[in-house]
């Protein structure tokens, strides 16, 4: 799925969420989240935030979303420790690999996962996790 297809799919999946575009990224907030402190989902399109995923490549973007500690552990093992400088965490994953669910390069310690340019099948498999992230954001 290219970036526009993903944006369309996410807007259809979360029609009541508020999407904010800033810093070459899209931030999804649950309806009613007036303070907008933490999105439940982001889509990053450039290396401005980190270079781990090499998003400067043609057609690359990264979909990021929160998981519960149990969801994270069942997929990747224990939550890693955050770096003191909040830099890229070494989880053993190639953060530039396309269409592969993996820990987020920086926010894995907070239970975030990501996928670089997911295919349609991968996206469909992620929908339950994305909906769960949205439900948590509503509370």
Where do the language-model regions lie?
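Charge-dense, helix-prone N-terminal extensions
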Residues: 1-139
């Amino acid at each position: 799925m290219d970036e526009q297809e993903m944006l369309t799919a996410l807007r259809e999946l979360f029609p009541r969420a508020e999407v904010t575009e800033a810093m070459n990224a899209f931030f999804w907030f649950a309806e009613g989240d007036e303070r907008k402190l933490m999105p439940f989902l982001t889509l990053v399109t450039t290396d401005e935030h980190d270079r781990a995923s090499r998003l400067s490549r043609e057609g690359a973007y990264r979909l990021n979303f929160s998981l519960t500690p149990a969801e994270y552990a069942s997929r990747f093992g224990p939550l890693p420790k955050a770096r003191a400088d909040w830099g890229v965490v070494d989880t053993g994953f190639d953060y530039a690999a396309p269409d592969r669910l993996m820990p987020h390069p920086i926010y894995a310690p907070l239970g975030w996962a990501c996928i670089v340019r997911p295919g349609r099948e991968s996206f469909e498999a992620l929908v339950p996790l994305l909906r769960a992230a949205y439900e948590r954001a509503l509370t």
